[in-house]
């Protein structure tokens, strides 16, 4: 179980380190081209959730994130034992939730910086924690689908 928590801790450290680099070395709104017309590091802040929804609702985010963190830890210890994919999915979500929670507690906003242009579409700016949440949810869905297939296979036998 400790190994899984180390994954979450590593993600939080990477998330907070990258955000610290952006905050300490860039002006708000400043953008650095990494790959022209595709990937930029852009110093951006967000007081809402994904794509700025529920902007400024910090108390709501504190409550929801606390419940989610407790729920993930509970689920990890009660339902994910023995399921490596589900355990990894949960700790990746946990790392992302904690990463953005730290920002909300100490900055009252989330630091975003990964800015991609896909063709002519400017994808919403995000961070490592956001990526962790997205990847974790995808892994969770895959784990759920695989478990359903296993259960169907058992019931047919």
From Swiss-Prot:
Protein topology in the membrane: Multi-pass membrane protein
Active site: 112, 130
Subcellular location per the Swiss-Prot or TrEMBL entry: Cell membrane
Pathway terms, separated by semicolons: Protein modification; lipoprotein biosynthesis (signal peptide cleavage)
Broadest EC class assigned to this enzyme: hydrolase
Disulfide-bonded cysteines: none
Domain of life of the organism encoding this protein: Bacteria
InterPro entries registered for this protein in UniProt: Peptidase_A8 (IPR001872)
Keyword Cell membrane: yes
One cellular component (GO) term of this entry: plasma membrane
Main subcellular location of this protein, as a coarse class: membrane
GO molecular function terms attached to this record: aspartic-type endopeptidase activity
Role noted for this protein: This protein specifically catalyzes the removal of signal peptides from prolipoproteins.
Transmembrane parts of this sequence: 56-76, 82-102, 125-145
Name of protein: Lipoprotein signal peptidase
Enzyme Commission number: 3.4.23.36
Reactions performed catalytically: Release of signal peptides from bacterial membrane prolipoproteins. Hydrolyzes -Xaa-Yaa-Zaa-|-(S,diacylglyceryl)Cys-, in which Xaa is hydrophobic (preferably Leu), and Yaa (Ala or Ser) and Zaa (Gly or Ala) have small, neutral side chains
A biological process from GO: proteolysis
Source lineage: Bacteria, Bacillati, Bacillota, Bacilli, Bacillales
One Pfam entry name: Peptidase_A8
Keywords: Aspartyl protease, Cell membrane, Hydrolase, Membrane, Protease, Transmembrane, Transmembrane helix
